[in-house]
Amino acid sequence: MNPAHLLVLSAVCVSLLGAANIPPHPLNLKNFMEMIRYTIPCEKTWGEYADYGCYCGAGGSGRPIDALDRCCYVHDNCYGDAETKHKCNPKTQSYSYKLTKRTIICYGAAGTCGRIVCDCDRTAALCFGDSEYIERHKNIDTKRHCQ
């Protein structure tokens, strides 16, 4: 084998070994982020929705503080129903969808885990696009506001 080829092959193997220790983002999270980016105003990033209100982000408690937070509350409950009623794993479930003409189309047979999770994400992303983003509700003190 040519020494140059051996060097390239070694570099590829080393990089693959390093990449094996990097946990992948669940495919569904990537899909959901893409849906959000498609529906929200251009000046916002999907990350600005990750720690908003009482329900946007990890966990959730109390009453939603506004319409946007209610979108996250409904999304959390939708995922909960997908897990308990349909035995789906929403965070890792793959699904097919299309972004077109300012809407989102979910594919797959009704009642399948892929379709159920896609519908949860679609509904939330469209809700985000229709709801006002209130800056003071970002990074709120959840112990104080979300009881």
UniProtKB/Swiss-Prot annotation:
<keyword id="KW-0106">Calcium</keyword>
<dbReference type="GO" id="GO:0016042">
    <property type="term" value="P:lipid catabolic process"/>
</dbReference>
<dbReference type="InterPro" id="IPR033113">
    <property type="entry name" value="PLipase_A2_His_AS"/>
</dbReference>
<protein>
    <recommendedName>
        <fullName>Basic phospholipase A2 beta-bungarotoxin A4 chain</fullName>
        <ecNumber>3.1.1.4</ecNumber>
    </recommendedName>
</protein>
<dbReference type="GO" id="GO:0090729">
    <property type="term" value="F:toxin activity"/>
</dbReference>
<keyword id="KW-0964">Secreted</keyword>
<feature type="propeptide">
    <location>
        <begin position="20"/>
        <end position="27"/>
    </location>
</feature>
<keyword id="KW-0638">Presynaptic neurotoxin</keyword>
<feature type="disulfide bond">
    <location>
        <begin position="88"/>
        <end position="113"/>
    </location>
</feature>
<feature type="binding site">
    <location>
        <position position="76"/>
    </location>
    <ligand>
        <name>Ca(2+)</name>
    </ligand>
</feature>
<feature type="binding site">
    <location>
        <position position="59"/>
    </location>
    <ligand>
        <name>Ca(2+)</name>
    </ligand>
</feature>
<feature type="active site">
    <location>
        <position position="121"/>
    </location>
</feature>
<keyword id="KW-0378">Hydrolase</keyword>
<dbReference type="InterPro" id="IPR001211">
    <property type="entry name" value="PLipase_A2"/>
</dbReference>
<feature type="active site">
    <location>
        <position position="75"/>
    </location>
</feature>
<feature type="binding site">
    <location>
        <position position="55"/>
    </location>
    <ligand>
        <name>Ca(2+)</name>
    </ligand>
</feature>
<keyword id="KW-0732">Signal</keyword>
<comment type="subunit">
    <text>Heterodimer; disulfide-linked. The A chain has phospholipase A2 activity and the B chain shows homology with the basic protease inhibitors.</text>
</comment>
<dbReference type="InterPro" id="IPR033112">
    <property type="entry name" value="PLipase_A2_Asp_AS"/>
</dbReference>
<dbReference type="GO" id="GO:0005543">
    <property type="term" value="F:phospholipid binding"/>
</dbReference>
<feature type="disulfide bond">
    <location>
        <begin position="78"/>
        <end position="120"/>
    </location>
</feature>
<dbReference type="InterPro" id="IPR016090">
    <property type="entry name" value="PLipase_A2_dom"/>
</dbReference>
<feature type="disulfide bond">
    <location>
        <begin position="54"/>
        <end position="146"/>
    </location>
</feature>
<dbReference type="GO" id="GO:0050482">
    <property type="term" value="P:arachidonate secretion"/>
</dbReference>
<dbReference type="GO" id="GO:0005576">
    <property type="term" value="C:extracellular region"/>
</dbReference>
<dbReference type="GO" id="GO:0006644">
    <property type="term" value="P:phospholipid metabolic process"/>
</dbReference>
<keyword id="KW-0479">Metal-binding</keyword>
<keyword id="KW-0800">Toxin</keyword>
<feature type="disulfide bond">
    <location>
        <begin position="106"/>
        <end position="118"/>
    </location>
</feature>
<keyword id="KW-0528">Neurotoxin</keyword>
<comment type="similarity">
    <text>Belongs to the phospholipase A2 family. Group I subfamily. D49 sub-subfamily.</text>
</comment>
<feature type="disulfide bond">
    <location>
        <begin position="71"/>
        <end position="127"/>
    </location>
</feature>
<feature type="signal peptide">
    <location>
        <begin position="1"/>
        <end position="19"/>
    </location>
</feature>
<keyword id="KW-0442">Lipid degradation</keyword>
<feature type="binding site">
    <location>
        <position position="57"/>
    </location>
    <ligand>
        <name>Ca(2+)</name>
    </ligand>
</feature>
<keyword id="KW-0443">Lipid metabolism</keyword>
<feature type="disulfide bond">
    <location>
        <begin position="56"/>
        <end position="72"/>
    </location>
</feature>
<dbReference type="GO" id="GO:0005509">
    <property type="term" value="F:calcium ion binding"/>
</dbReference>
<dbReference type="GO" id="GO:0047498">
    <property type="term" value="F:calcium-dependent phospholipase A2 activity"/>
</dbReference>
<dbReference type="Pfam" id="PF00068">
    <property type="entry name" value="Phospholip_A2_1"/>
</dbReference>
<comment type="function">
    <text>Snake venom phospholipase A2 (PLA2) that shows presynaptic neurotoxicity. The A chain has phospholipase activity. PLA2 catalyzes the calcium-dependent hydrolysis of the 2-acyl groups in 3-sn-phosphoglycerides.</text>
</comment>
<dbReference type="InterPro" id="IPR036444">
    <property type="entry name" value="PLipase_A2_dom_sf"/>
</dbReference>
